[in-house]
Amino acid sequence: MSQSAQHHAINYIEFTTTDIAGTRAFYEKAFSWNFQDYGPEYIAFNKDQAGIDGGFRKGGPQQSQSDAAPLIVLYSQDLKATQDAIIAVGGSIVVPTFDFPGGKRFHFSDGQGNVLAVWSE
């Protein structure tokens, strides 16, 4: 994920796929995208080719459209302050902060049916 990210801006998009190898092959052949591997369950693409940094994570078959929805990821300079602001206006943390290669992130619900994530170094 980009180190020069703007605070609270959309910075990353994450999709779910049941077939990492097939997804990689499709986007490499269709759009000439290159990928970075993060193990057998995650591949990432970059904004130089795709217009935004993002990735595909391995997941099970989607049961509904909301299960298949991409995950929009915002950047924060201060995860704790951002969590506090979300909770203060009625949002909820649905996935607690966890480490991933490149930083930490959490997922939140805005109370209107949308789930987004926030990350930081």
Residue ranges of model-derived segments:
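Vicinal oxygen chelate
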Residues: 1-6, 10-18, 36, 62-121
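N-terminal beta-strand motif that seeds the catalytic metal site of vicinal oxygen chelate
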Residues: 1-24, 51-52, 70-72
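N-terminal first-folded block
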Residues: 9-45
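Conserved active-site tyrosine of GNAT-family acetyltransferases
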Residues: 23-27, 86, 113
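Conserved short beta-strand elements that form part of the metal-binding/catalytic scaffold
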Residues: 33-67, 115-120
